[in-house]
Amino acid sequence: MQTRSSRMAGFGHAVPARCVDNAEIEASLGLEAGWIERRTGIRSRYWAEAGDTLSGLAERAGRMALEDAKINADDIALTLLATSTPDHLLPPSAPLLAHRLGLTRSGAIDLAGACSGFLYALTLADGFVRTYGRAVLVVAANILSRRINPAERASAVLFADAAGAVVLTPCPEVKRGVLSADLVADGSGYDLIQIAAGGSSQPFSAGMIAEDALMTMRDGREVFSRAVALMTNTSQRVLHEAELTAADISRFVPHQANARMSDAVCGNLGIEREKTVRTIGSFGNSSAATIPLSLSITNAERPLAGGETLLLTAAGAGMTGGAVVYRV
């Protein structure tokens, strides 16, 4: 029998200093003015500069969340870092993050779940809090600008750098936290979005072409249609499992991949547009970081109140994806 749940006790986010507007990218790709915003909803995004690191970006977001939660560092028992762009292939970046934040009693691991990584981390964190009654720091962060192929329009116009963080703490009210979750994978779309080189299947080599170390989106339309279907279907299942309808959702926080994608999923679910949290216009697509960044921003604009019901959903490379209903 459940005796506790989890509570979102603190939020944080961080972006690099450099803001890149559409005009700069449109000029480099030979696109007409306004092309990017019309097709993606993005007006600007943030890209890392020479001294920026993934762990540094994650640290800023994590510290903000810890301060917001007003929690002692010794109370954090686990640190989960969802990222596709760690500082190094080995070791993982999460132990360094925990060290810099002074989390001396925390375990720490990286999770590589692409754009849906935060949902996986959040679901695992909620289970840990319920089982062990100890707090968890969840951070999602990416520096995607260093993996963009500047000549490939599909990825060059979308991707951004950012970090978002949430602190989960134990809560005695069992009807809070994750009410339902549906995490899925479809490996038939494994190569739709990829960085070919760097793994054990294709290690870095002296004769490697530069593009193999950069992100490639093989078929943008296929990615769009699969992602919309995946996010719609998983969202419908978690609503059904939680015995809720779209009308019961207080805020809908989808992965900020593309404004048209969010609109399509929102329409499929029958969720009112004003309930949808949108940050893609100013921050672009930072993969797993978009949902916690959006949570931090919406909480700053209008604090999340106890009892609010959130619907979170994402889809990304792999393909991986899912949806979560979370009661604040």
UniProtKB/Swiss-Prot annotation:
Effect of residue 255 to A: Retains low activity
The UniProt record lists the keyword Amino-acid biosynthesis: no
Effect on the protein upon substituting residue 260 to A: Exhibits poor activity. Loss of activity
Keyword Transferase: yes
Catalytic reactions of this protein: malonyl-[ACP] + an acyl-CoA + H(+) = a 3-oxoacyl-[ACP] + CO2 + CoA; glutaryl-CoA + malonyl-[ACP] + H(+) = 3-oxo-6-carboxyhexanoyl-[ACP] + CO2 + CoA
Any single biological process term in GO: secondary metabolite biosynthetic process
InterPro entries in the record: ACP_syn_III_C, ACP_syn_III_N, BioZ, Thiolase-like
ACP-binding: annotated span: 256-260
Keywords of the record: Acyltransferase, Biotin biosynthesis, Transferase
Effect of mutating residue 115 to S: Loss of activity. Biotin auxotroph
GO molecular function, one term: 3-oxoacyl-[acyl-carrier-protein] synthase activity
E.C. code: 2.3.1.-
Coiled coil: none
Pathway: Cofactor biosynthesis; biotin biosynthesis
Domain of life: Bacteria
Protein name: 3-oxopimeloyl-[acyl-carrier-protein] synthase
